[in-house]
């Protein structure tokens, strides 16, 4: 009889893929099977995020709840970025935790499960060529890591301290994984990296003469691959070659995440982002011109230390010019180990909240206009999900979530849908037979 695994994943798509790797390792090597019922689990894992303070607080509230809900003899493990930066502190604050496994140490999961009070948080551990077992949360798409770690050292970001330096995964391994996924029915390939379009700058073994644009072309040539998505690219590496391949390759989905963070060049310099307001606008507006149907999402931090009212207005100006389809916006959150946490000119919470509210309110107005403009458009939709309220949903080529009436027979297929009732979260439509 197999043992039961309950796993909760917080944070980014990289964490989702790490959790898939953990599930594969434990199911194939330790005979675990997944359960959604925490009370029957023999092993309870939480894969954590530490980009902001809130997910760190959530970790300790969640593991406390796990301890109360778990059955006798069940183990609790903490994985991911918070595990990397807190390490043994987790044992002190939650002594009922059985092991701590950092984000760069996923391949050690079987050892962790079988070793009392195991801890491994080595951010220099190299997993770029480790052959993980295969598990996909969805049969219709496959998340695939193309690099690990981050070299950028942005002053507000803890990720380089939890995931280590950037290493590209050999292209031969990536292509084999894509081929395997496509043969098993995954028509959409989702490429992952902290700076995904910096791919090819450094390998741990044999160096390759390849960049991200080249890799995209190679993946698009694999039989069975119909759609390619990726996250998260860095604006600094969006050269003309990259934009041209993105625009002209018919298998690359026309949605681009462009993390702005701030629209002010001085603030960007303090953040160590490596680009200016002018560079960002040039890339974004050129992309809009080259690819009119593209949807652009972004990340924005308001109230970074020292940000003046006028500097915040530059962020609002970029919002007006680019008109992002989606924004992920936050008040600046000081993170341990980061340079910005030591800056003396921190912004008070009242000012930060006012700026965030203004930004989000204006984007809501822009989004309403964007959504309304989708009425009567016809999209090719790749259906992946049965909805609780009936019908099936999937993504358009430019990343709108579309729902139509239909059954599970539509899952894993691409169909044309005409938008009849566009809403912010979902565009409701009708199949075009």
UniProtKB/Swiss-Prot annotation:
Cofactor(s) required, per the database record: [4Fe-4S] cluster
Residues the record lists as binding [4Fe-4S] cluster 1: 12, 49, 81
Superkingdom assignment: Bacteria
Gene Ontology cellular component terms for the protein in this record: cytosol
Record domain Radical SAM core: where: 136-369
A Pfam family per the record: UPF0004
Catalysed reactions, semicolon-separated: N(6)-dimethylallyladenosine(37) in tRNA + (sulfur carrier)-SH + AH2 + 2 S-adenosyl-L-methionine = 2-methylsulfanyl-N(6)-dimethylallyladenosine(37) in tRNA + (sulfur carrier)-H + 5'-deoxyadenosine + L-methionine + A + S-adenosyl-L-homocysteine + 2 H(+)
Family, per entry: Belongs to the methylthiotransferase family. MiaB subfamily.
EC number per UniProt: 2.8.4.3
Domain TRAM: residue ranges: 372-433
PROSITE patterns: MTTASE_N, MTTASE_RADICAL, RADICAL_SAM, TRAM
Organism of derivation: Campylobacter concisus (strain 13826)
Subcellular location: Cytoplasm
Protein task: Catalyzes the methylthiolation of N6-(dimethylallyl)adenosine (i(6)A), leading to the formation of 2-methylthio-N6-(dimethylallyl)adenosine (ms(2)i(6)A) at position 37 in tRNAs that read codons beginning with uridine.
Gene (name only): miaB
Binding annotation for [4Fe-4S] cluster 2: 150, 154, 157
Protein name: tRNA-2-methylthio-N(6)-dimethylallyladenosine synthase
Chief place of localization: cytoplasm
Keywords: 4Fe-4S, Cytoplasm, Iron, Iron-sulfur, Metal-binding, S-adenosyl-L-methionine, Transferase, tRNA processing
């Amino acid at each position: 009889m197999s043992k039961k695994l309950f796993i909760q994943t917080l944070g980014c798509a990289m964490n989702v893929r790490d959790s898939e790797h953990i599930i594969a390792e434990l199911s194939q090597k330790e005979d675990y099977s997944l359960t959604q019922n925490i009370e029957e689990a023999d092993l309870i894992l939480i894969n954590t995020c530490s980009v902001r303070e809130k997910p760190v607080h959530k970790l300790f509230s969640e593991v406390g709840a796990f301890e109360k809900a778990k059955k006798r003899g069940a183990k609790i493990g903490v994985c991911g970025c918070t595990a990397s930066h807190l390490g043994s502190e987790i044992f002190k604050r939650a002594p009922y935790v059985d092991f701590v496994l950092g984000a760069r140490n996923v391949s050690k999961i079987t050892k962790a499960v079988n070793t009392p009070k195991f801890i491994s948080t080595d951010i220099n551990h190299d997993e770029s060529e480790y052959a993980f077992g295969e598990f996909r949360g969805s049969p219709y798409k496959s998340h695939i890591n193309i690099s690990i770690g981050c070299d950028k050292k942005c002053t507000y970001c803890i990720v380089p301290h939890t995931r280590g330096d950037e290493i590209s995964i050999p292209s031969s391994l990536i292509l084999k994984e894509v081929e395997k996924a496509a043969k098993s029915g995954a028509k959409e390939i989702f490429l992952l990296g902290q700076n995904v379009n910096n791919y090819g700058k450094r390998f741990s073994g044999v160096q390759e003469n390849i960049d991200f644009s080249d890799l995209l072309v190679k993946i698009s040539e694999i039989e069975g691959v119909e759609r390619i998505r990726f996250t998260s690219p860095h604006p600094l590496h969006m050269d003309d070659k990259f934009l041209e391949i993105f625009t002209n390759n018919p298998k690359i989905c026309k949605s681009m995440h462009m993390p702005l963070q701030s629209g002010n060049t001085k603030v960007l310099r303090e953040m160590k982002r490596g680009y200016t307001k002018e560079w960002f606008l040039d890339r974004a507006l050129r992309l809009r011109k080259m690819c009119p149907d593209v949807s652009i999402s972004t990340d924005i931090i308001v109230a970074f230390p020292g940000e003046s009212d006028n500097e915040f207005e530059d962020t609002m100006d970029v919002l007006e010019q680019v008109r992002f389809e989606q924004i992920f916006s936050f008040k600046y959150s000081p993170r341990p180990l980061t340079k910005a946490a030591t800056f003396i000119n921190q912004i008070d919470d009242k000012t930060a909240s006012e700026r965030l509210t203004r930004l989000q309110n204006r984007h809501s107005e822009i989004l309403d206009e964007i959504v309304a403009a989708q009425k009567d458009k016809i999209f090719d939709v790749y259906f992946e999900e049965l909805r609780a309220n009936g019908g099936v949903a999937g993504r358009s080529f430019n990343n709108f979530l579309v729902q139509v009436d239909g059954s599970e027979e539509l899952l894993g297929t691409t169909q044309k849908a005409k938008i009849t009732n566009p809403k912010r979260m979902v565009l409701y439509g009708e199949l075009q037979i």
